[in-house]
């Protein structure tokens, strides 16, 4: 993939630095709407070289760092994980956010313990996309084989939702956000954008979201709304 912007600073709603690192690739790769897994490399040495350069930009200005890698934290190489820990200690990072697919939930406890040992609290985010199990599994192929939101949230702290898809309504989107806020600390709403998959954004559903749903949450400090997948400042093409 072309060079991308991999470091940014989020100044509103839970201010933090964010880095887009590169791993060996999402192990799931079955979500019908997602092509993020294309940002990967099988060469761990090359990944570490790239990731170390990105992590060198972290200043610790907010004491909070979000690490994303177009997959799950466990797909990052060991030297990169060591470097993340070193940067947290060196820059005074007290809160560290990672992403994780449901299939890797069994690895979360060890991750939390590792960083807790150096005084860093971890926050794990899962891409749920919707709490409508039939839509999530039959249409989106997320691979989360349970229906109970509380069970999904048991090992996670934050969730991502995906809106702007055919079949979604104002009521379904509001219900997803409310369910997310009930069971998770934070909710990140992503609006579908055109990518390389056959799944297309539905402009009518997006209009409904913008007019009837988003205004109720745009000022909620626990809800991030990304109209574009680059709104956090990473992922766009580097100049």
Protein language model features and the residues they cover:
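Short amphipathic alpha-helices and their capping/turn segments at secondary-structure boundaries
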Residues: 52-58, 104-119, 174-183
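Core AdoMet radical
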Residues: 36-51, 58-78, 88-107, 121-146, ...
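Distinct, well-ordered alpha-helical segments
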Residues: 76-85, 105-116, 137, 170-174
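Generic low-complexity, intrinsically disordered segments
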Residues: 94, 113-117, 153-155
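N-terminal pre-core extensions flanking Radical SAM catalytic domains
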Residues: 1-3, 8-10, 30-33, 226-239
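Canonical Radical SAM [4Fe-4S] cluster-binding loop centered on the CxxxCxxC motif
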Residues: 4-49
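Short, flexible/disordered intra-domain loops and linkers
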Residues: 44-45, 78, 138-140, 170-171, ...
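Conserved C-terminal portion of the radical SAM core fold
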Residues: 145-202, 208-232
